[in-house]
Amino acid sequence: MAGKGINIKVKRAAIIKALHDRLTEMVHIQEEYEREVEAYEKARLKWEEEVAQVTLKSIDFKTICDNINIRKGYSANNNQTNVMIDVMIDDNKLPVEPEGVKNPFRNTWSGKTYLGNYEERVAEIKNAITILNLSDEETVNTSTYANVAKYL
């Protein structure tokens, strides 16, 4: 019995409903993620402005020549010079950097199975729902269920 696989029948309607529910959940998760990314980008711009202000206030013009890097001709317009100044600032004088947002649907692997990004997963779920709706069978076999279960 150790080598014998399990064989069950799963109701097609139950799988379709579960896929619809998962699709709805994914849409809500993606919308929340997009709102969080937008808020993060605004916070990041504000943080960069604050860092620039602290940096400008921290420049010691007496010692600036020790920390200056001048490059000529590296820009698209060779009539410009790129001047970079390294300014050392204690971290405790800088504002706290906003934390990035983790993408809930980044490309990933689950064992040997590739799970794509949001768009790829939505397309796969919609495709599975379409195929399951075309079937007139009341149940589906274990292998069909296994193929769609990764999205549930």
Model-based region annotation:
Residues 2-4, 145-152:
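Short acidic DE-rich linear segments
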Residues 16, 20-23, 27-30, 37, ...:
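Heptad-repeat amphipathic alpha-helical coiled-coil interaction surface used
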Residues 49, 53, 57-133:
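Acidic, low-complexity, intrinsically disordered interaction modules
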Residues 1-38, 87-88, 94-97, 106-108:
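Short, charged, low-complexity amphipathic alpha-helix
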Residues 14-19, 27, 41-43, 48, ...:
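Hydrophobic face of amphipathic alpha-helices
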Residues 68-70, 140-149:
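Extended, charge-rich alpha-helical interface modules
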